[in-house]
């Protein structure tokens, strides 16, 4: 690494604001020049050091993957498990307040395993502690997504190599694992809880459950079964609300039809991935 690029780089404090969708969250944002440094840091170094070693079952914030592919991957796993086991069990895990509870010292130690360049280590520490606290990553920073993925890659590797779980999928802090029996599901979940608490200082929240395969699983905004993938009712309600809001904006002259359609086009992929017949027609029945 060229030391000239980092020796005079000072990462300054970040600003914060709140968003209410999909729930109340504090978003912390670095100044423009720091955001340039963050992108350079992730794209030129973290990709090389860490992303190549990620499990194939990790889907968040990775090129060529994403939420929709994660859902399709879970569905393919379910089809396969139905063929080999017929009935099986689903462990659905969700980490409690994930970004807020990441232990920076543990994360830094994980990063140090692969990063040996002293200048890059210095910059890593500067970025990691830029908000002045020892626990939690700022939601909104480009580096936070990468750091968060690296942190739970520890869980991916534990499930794969220690627990010998073949059928898992993780989208950031949402995790699905498929196992043969209820007994195995309980045993594996208990081991995962212990690993998260002892090694990463994390806990699973109350959404974490064990289901029979016939119930399917809620994951990344979809209700997934082996041969059906539907948008959850909560997602449908949000889409309907957005469509009505845009109709009102257009009627009041606050937005053009072209602008409204451009906004809606971003949601069509979300709908088209699912096996939801006529939903698009119902949502967009009214001409905007």
Enumerate the predicted regions with their spans.
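Conserved two-metal-ion catalytic palm core of "right-hand" nucleic acid polymerases
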Residues: 1-107, 115
